[in-house]
Amino acid sequence: MKINVLDEQMQLENPELAIGRITKPVILEIWNGRQKDSVIRREYPYTRITQTENGLKACAEIEDEWVGKTEVTDVYCVEEGSVVLSRQVRILKESEYPGIRLRTEISLFPERKNNFEELRYFAPPAIYDKNDLDEDGYEDYFHTKKIIFRDDRFNYPMFTCYSEETKEAVSIERDPLPAFDSNPVRKISEETGEKEAFFLQKTDIGSMGADGSDGSTRLTCCYPFYEGDATIALYIVKMVPFGAFWPLRSGEEFTVTYRISNHKYENYHDACWYGIRDIIRKTHPQAEPLSVPPE
């Protein structure tokens, strides 16, 4: 894989085709503190891109009423056939808004068929194909084309999309793995009368998945986490969005790193099997002893 800059867009390519395109390099979601109509999406271009020994370094220096003064630094590296994207957000001066979230969107196979129905997905145990047993093109549990889950709902934080047309699989994973979590303070909302579904939280848990709600499919990652139009966590009660925001305060900063990989497979089942096999070979998972006896 290699990285190309196309009119302020970042394109990920293999020798045969473009496998992904980042059309909006910096997407920040601002929380206004409410539970309804509460997320303000802001998109920014890079203000500076420089070549590095094995990739690119891109910066966005932003100052406005939404994010205060914030700096986003992205480092793209080609490493062992993958593209590693490390993202850092630094709050230099706060705004009047309490929370912020970083969003990463990669349009898949931008020069080929890439609507939600054309691709197949794998992220055990949450997603196998589309969980679409009735074959209507929608995920069956939530009837949605937006399947985004917290990193820790997966056996391993990796999400794979496979194209039957090109026989190409594209995967995104957290590398290194999430290192910490915390218990958020979820107050009873005066708007809903229930515990907050949006809240401030310093956590290293993000979310990832696919969003095909607008006709083309994007690999989508959020940091801190956000879970689509519905969430497994709250599904028993009702279908509501669920997500955290990092405190938008002077001096705060956070970093997240993704590895984007691309391989060609004869079929979807090979993409699933060999993807998991490669993760096992790379991570060498070991059984952890129980902290207390099972009885």
Features from the language model and the residues they span:
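An acidic-aromatic substrate-binding cleft motif
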Residues: 265-295
